[in-house]
Amino acid sequence: MNRREFLQLGLGASAFVAGCRCPFCCAGKKPIALQLWSINKVMWKEDPAKTFADIKAIGYDGVEFAGFNGLSAKQIKKLLGDAGLRGMGAHISGDKEYTGDGLKKNLDFLTEAGIESMTSAWADYNDADGWKKFGDLMGKAADIAVDWNIPISVHNHCHEFKKVYDGVYAWDLIFRDSSPRLQQQLDTSQVVNPGLDVVERLKKYPGRSFSIHMKENVPMKHGLPNDNGYFGVPPPDGGKLVDFKGTVDYLANEPGFSWYVIECERKPESLDAARFNYGFLSNLI
């Protein structure tokens, strides 16, 4: 798909920029959100209002939810508004959440809460047909969500680039024939870990990256992530670092790109890693 075809999508990713839903996009500098799973040990166990205020004080522009802890849309909107944060998005997984009444319910909730996007955080299938059907389902959901002005994305883990069918990655089975409105939310760590290049994967589907998860490479040791949570700091086993600068340089001219999302899941008990990584990334953009 070339740039002209992308721009002709109307209410595809380009429309979110044209409508300037995200004011930072029009200004040039893209905003930074924190994926709240990064602080899952404290997010809902302490005072959420104080935690949100602390996130804002670091400099973050928004947050991406990983569950709502039973709060209503109005309560979520108030938390965001009181802290001066934007609701960048929410990770919501499960096929039923992207079809029929389940999809409508989610889109209505996100709209009321002031949350800007919806992302499937996990999927796994045992054959090529399963991945293709998932891509079709998600593409149809993305087309429907246009009426709510909410982009829908799929987030990757390592297995989408480790499962290969007749020479085709599972990730590509999701995207190559699905609606061009369906967005990819690449996780930099889980692109680099299987041995791929983040920029090359972004180039594969131009104009289909509303957001990206910026996370340092997480080599595995004994089945567990083996990193220290800090961008630019080599993991204990000396694994390859993510090329954050190269990624930022490429995304500076990517049509439809709207949000950086920092994730640092190895330090969930405090905001220390979130603070360090915000400083690291903000200096690049």
Give the label of every model feature segment:
Residues E5-F24:
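N-terminal export signals
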Residues C20-E46, D54:
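C-terminal segment of N-terminal export signals and the immediately downstream linker at the start
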Residues I32-Q35, V63-F65, G87-I92, M118-S120, ...:
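Hydrophobic faces of well-ordered beta-strands that scaffold small-molecule active sites
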Residues K41-K45, E64-K74, S93-G102, D124-K132, ...:
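Acidic-and-aromatic substrate-binding clefts and catalytic sites of carbohydrate-active enzymes
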Residues D95-Q183:
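Active-site acidic/histidine proton-transfer and metal-coordination neighborhood
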Residues W148-D237:
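Acidic/histidine-rich catalytic cores of soluble enzymes
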